[in-house]
């Protein structure tokens, strides 16, 4: 009997879209699906490392670049709109050909607007139903366009918790929602086990007394997790490496540049610090446990992955990236994290202020395989 097959493709707008798909793909594999992943570059490298049994198909990404200065980002993205439109058309045509060859039973797109097929159940994954832009008029206009486009998909799956106790505020819980069926999936984290019961929360499935247990001799002051499009990825990497070495404290920085051949490649080190290109999940968990503070962009997937470890979080949103700026402000208001603008960030000041900051624990409801089964059944009704 032929196994059901699924083709899934995450957008290449930061590694988070790929890493959050790992949990979902593993769940599909447990349900007996043959998984095909359409991607390229860094995303392919990190997914191949985590998912050796999946089949990979080459699909070019959007290849978006950011501005060096935040105030330029809207203009830089505006000039890339033709490239984005071309990518949407290209991926749509690519999928029509791939569907004729492989005959997928289900298609899942993580924020790729052209990755759907009219004859096959097609799911769109996003936590941004209300994308925050620099102007309110632009926010409303984009939401109308997005909702109209989402009608081409069978359903929308949202990696968050429905209602007031959510992680992304109005991004995933807007006042007005799309007309297609929605499923709030819970939190996707490749660093924790997927639960098997719909109502389980992470505290019910993980022993918090052991998840943060570490050897004090290996403790570091901070772990810097770098990600996102260039040139901002490199700018943050250099900022954290230089500032950490100036303070002469133990720390680790992960550059967010995975390699197919060297998943745990060490770029450079000295007596106090290490800079890795990327760390596989077990090694990443080890460094998270060792760190007193985690410094990162505050991208949504990173937040989902870090919550179970109950670490003190410091965000440096990508300049001009309104989603991360919104999440940083929201999480700081709830005392879940500290947030600093990159142009004003001073590592010594941030670490001093973090000592006196009253950090609180963000809520976390785990993604569930049983809920996934129910969501799949809804697609075929």
Region locations from a protein language model:
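Short amphipathic alpha-helix
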Residues: 18-28, 43
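A short, glycine/small-residue-rich beta-strand->loop->alpha-helix junction that serves as a flexible
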Residues: 10-22, 230-234
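A donor-sugar binding/catalytic signature common to diverse glycosyltransferases
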Residues: 283-326
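Conserved nucleotide-sugar donor-binding subdomain of glycosyltransferases
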Residues: 72-114
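Active-site-proximal region of nucleotide-activated glycan assembly enzymes
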Residues: 118-184, 189-190
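Donor-nucleotide binding loops and adjacent catalytic segments primarily
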Residues: 172-173, 186-293
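Leloir-type glycosyltransferase catalytic cores
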Residues: 80-83, 336-381
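Conserved nucleotide-sugar phosphate-binding/catalytic loop shared by glycosyltransferases and other
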Residues: 2-7, 12, 30-81, 274
């Amino acid at each position: 009997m032929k196994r059901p097959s699924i083709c899934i493709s995450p957008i290449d707008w930061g590694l988070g879209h790929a890493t959050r798909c790992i949990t979902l793909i593993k769940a599909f594999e447990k349900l007996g699906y043959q998984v095909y992943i359409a991607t390229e570059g860094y995303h392919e490298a990190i997914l191949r490392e985590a998912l050796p049994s999946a089949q990979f198909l080459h699909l070019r990404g959007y290849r978006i670049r950011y501005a060096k200065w935040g105030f330029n980002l809207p203009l830089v993205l505006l000039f890339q709109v033709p490239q984005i439109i071309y990518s949407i058309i290209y991926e749509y045509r690519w999928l029509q050909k791939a569907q004729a060859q492989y005959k997928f039973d289900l298609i899942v797109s993580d924020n790729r607007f052209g990755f759907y097929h009219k004859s096959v159940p097609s799911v769109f994954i996003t936590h941004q139903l209300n994308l925050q832009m620099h102007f309110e008029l632009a926010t409303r206009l984009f939401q109308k366009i997005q909702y109209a486009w989402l009608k081409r998909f069978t359903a929308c799956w949202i990696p968050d918790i429905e209602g007031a106790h959510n992680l992304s505020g109005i991004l995933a819980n807007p006042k007005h929602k799309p007309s297609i069926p929605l499923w709030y999936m819970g939190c996707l984290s490749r660093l924790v086990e997927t639960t098997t019961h719909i109502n389980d929360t992470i505290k019910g499935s993980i022993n918090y007394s052991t998840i943060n247990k570490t050897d004090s001799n290996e403790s570091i002051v901070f772990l810097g997790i770098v990600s996102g499009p260039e040139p901002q990825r490199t700018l943050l990497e250099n900022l954290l490496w230089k500032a950490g070495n100036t303070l002469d404290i133990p720390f680790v920085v992960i550059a967010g540049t995975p390699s197919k051949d060297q998943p745990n490649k060490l770029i450079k080190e000295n007596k106090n610090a290490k800079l890795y290109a990327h760390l596989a999940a077990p090694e990443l968990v080890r460094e998270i446990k060792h760190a007193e503070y985690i410094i990162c962009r505050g991208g949504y997937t990173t937040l989902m992955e870090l919550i179970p470890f109950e670490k003190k979080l410091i965000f440096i949103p990508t300049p001009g990236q309104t989603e991360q700026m919104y999440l940083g402000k929201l999480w700081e208001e709830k005392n879940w994290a500290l947030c600093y603008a990159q142009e004003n960030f001073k590592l010594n000041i941030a670490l001093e202020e973090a000592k006196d900051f009253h950090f609180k624990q963000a809520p976390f409801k785990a993604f569930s395989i049983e809920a996934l089964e129910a969501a799949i059944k809804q697609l075929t009704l």
